[in-house]
Curated annotation (Swiss-Prot):
Protein name stated in the entry: Uncharacterized protein MJ0073
InterPro entries cross-referenced by the UniProt entry: HAD-like_sf, HAD_sf
Length: 93
């Protein structure tokens, strides 16, 4: 989906609106979001599972705090999703 910054006034709000549309169109599905920037904060906070990636460029602190899981790079995020045991280990009580 294209993020329409002009329609919503900011990329942060546009991403949130896309998430809301996805949830509405897929009420029985869990929506996972991955990001690291200021513009991803609301997206990760409102996704069913928000994964913040702290890559070489770093990550926005409020986005880190708004996420459910924090990883060091995108490959780790994808590995969590591909390996159910890793995700269970990370999210267990």
């Amino acid at each position: 989906m294209k993020v329409d910054r002009e329609k919503y006034g900011s990329e942060k709000i546009a991403k949130l609106k896309i998430l809301e549309e996805l949830k509405k169109e897929n009420p029985n599905k869990k929506i996972i979001a991955i990001g690291n920037g200021n513009n991803d904060e609301l997206l990760l906070k409102n996704a069913d599972l928000g994964i913040c990636v702290i890559g070489d460029e770093g990550a926005w602190s409020k986005t880190i705090l708004s996420s459910d899981i924090v990883v060091k790079d995108i490959n780790d995020a994808l590995d969590l999703l591909l390996n159910e045991n890793r995700l269970k280990a990370t999210s267990r009580d």
